[in-house]
Amino acid sequence: ADSGEVDQLGQILAGIADGSLAPMRPDEEPKGSSKPAQKKPAQKKPETQLAQTKPSKTKPARSPRVRTLVIMIDPGHGGEDPGAIGRRHRTREKDVVLAVARILRQELNEIEGVKALLTRDGDYFVPLQRRVQKARAAKADFFVSIHADAWVKPTARGSSLYVLNTRGQVSTANRWLARKQNDADLIGGVNLSNKDKQIARILMDMSMTSQVSDSMVYGARILNELSRINQLHRGKVEQANFAVLKAPDIPSVLVETAFLSHPEEEKKLRTRAFQRKLAYAIGNGILKGFGHKSRLG
């Protein structure tokens, strides 16, 4: 890890301690609202009042502020990194996933109370750690990385979804802590001396455990939606040690949309219709996870 990654640990731990970095939990309603998200309505001219009513002496209650649900969408690869290459049509993964991500962003941003962002919006490379940093800087409630799979055998097919495998994650946290000077390691403004390192490790472990648990819930919703439009490669949420899934304070999933190495799936991935179906499936899984009643498509 470079010094930039290490310097983030104090901020992460401080947020864990005071709760300021905690994202929405699965099925949590946006704060201040019990109504489901709806499409943003067009502004209408106020209708003429036909009857005069006696004004109330009591002041009307202020409308509670609705918390915006922030979704960071990560189109994999980009620039000099094309990702997987299709066998028959030489379709590049970086192009397909960017198209899906752009559709997903556009559709989610039509939902009131939802804000969707991209880690890249063009054909350029973004380092993996920078993608995570962008999500944290935006205070994202959810992170979804979109990819297209490939395998040596052309028979492999289907959609997959991954969350972080926490095995070995404690050692990663230990390396971060070891690189950080004691006088700058802060949890809620408290200096982390050597005797406090164990506390920091415990907090990091608790945060990662919670992140993976929430990610599994969201992932299951998304995978169920994907099963409606495409065959699943495996019928369950899988776990792997992907670098882009390592934000300890943001539930994160990685979606493998289909196999570019499979001739039929490569052909489908090239079509706008299937790209839109994928975007809708991912978006609807996310919305369900956060308790929204609106659906894309």
PLM features: residue spans?
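Surface-exposed edge beta-strands and adjoining flexible/disordered loops or tails in beta-rich
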Residues: 1-27
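Generic hydrophobic, helix-prone segments enriched in Leu/Val/Ile
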Residues: 9-13, 176, 203-206
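Short intrinsically disordered coil segments
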Residues: 11, 176-180, 270-274
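Catalytic-core regions of hydrolytic enzymes
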Residues: 20-197, 208-220, 280, 296
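Active-site-adjacent mobile loop/cap segments within catalytic or ligand-binding domains
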Residues: 91, 152, 203-297
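Short, basic/glycine-rich phosphate-binding loops at helix/coil junctions
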Residues: 198-202
